[in-house]
Amino acid sequence: GGHPLEDLVLVGVAGLVVLAVRRALRPDVRLPSAAAPQRPVMIWNAKSGGGKAVTHDLPAQARRRGIEPVELTEGTDLRALLEQLVDEGADGLAAAGGDGTQAVVAAVAAEHDLPFACIPAGTRNHFALDLGVDRDDVVGALDAFVDGGERVVDLAEVNGTVFVNNCSLGLYAEAVQRDEYRGAKLRTILATATEAFGPSDAVTLDYRWTGPDGSIEQGATVILVSNDVYRLGGGVGAGTRPRLDAGVLGVAVLRSPDTASTGAPVPLWSAWSVTEFEVDADEPAHDGSVHVGVDGEAMTMTSPLRFTTRPGAL
């Protein structure tokens, strides 16, 4: 092997290259100036991200900037709370919590044509990453309502429920219904699928959808529908979206090897973009209900699932 010092230098150079590429991939958008809201509020969750809002003293930091902090407590109807705040005169809505919270606050902001600020106080903060918000500067994100610029981005929805990142069906959606897998990454769940759920055919549910060529397809382990298109694969930048204003849904379908090996050749993984997408699903319960993971939150919806994009809604 090489000299330890040479190895250290190579590792250091490799790390700098990766960092440089990541910075190059980070959205760098020069934003037009926007008038600051006069009565902004910040919804914050003390438990999100291991307590980031508390660690960074976000309520006090918000008050210093003229932003009213409103704590989201367990059992609170977030949408009803937001509607009440808007009725009372709130003219800007910020969300300091996970992506599920971001989606609800963003939806209400869009409905009332109010400015929205994403505060990266969740665990992964995927929406913040793709917006170009510095996830390491939690407090600095509050300045969006002080001297920030305006950026218009898309939202997406499934059966009337808004999402900012993605909606998952199949194995991942089944997993997030379970406490032990909540918050786990998709690749972790896939790696332990057989152990957790049994044979692969037990998690290949009867989904039917229209493929990119217009044909009806069925049989999938995972269907992922996203607000705009993710970079896929294992390279640097994978799992991020270069644009949030393309006005499309990204669709990615993963099949089990058993499904793909029967009949005509079928790729294990396929991806494309559309503006509308529909999935018919027969769950084992046969009651028309479908387990869905919406921005990481476990939900149950009624089939068929109708996905649409809302270009420039936020």
Question: What is each of the regions a protein language model found here?
Answer:
Residues A95-D99:
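N-terminal glycine-rich "phosphate-gripper" loop used for MgATP/nucleotide binding
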Residues G1-R22, P212, R243-A246, V253-L314:
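ATP/nucleoside-binding phosphotransfer catalytic cores, i.e., glycine-rich phosphate-binding loops
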Residues A220-R255:
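Active-site beta-loop-alpha substructure in enzyme catalytic cores
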Residues R182-D201, G235-G237, G250-A271:
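Alpha-helical membrane-targeting segments
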Residues G100-V105, H126-F127:
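Short glycine/serine/threonine-rich phosphate/pyrophosphate-binding segments
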Residues Y172-A175, I216-G219, R231-G235, T259-T262:
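Short acidic/glycine-rich loop or secondary-structure boundary segments that cap or lie
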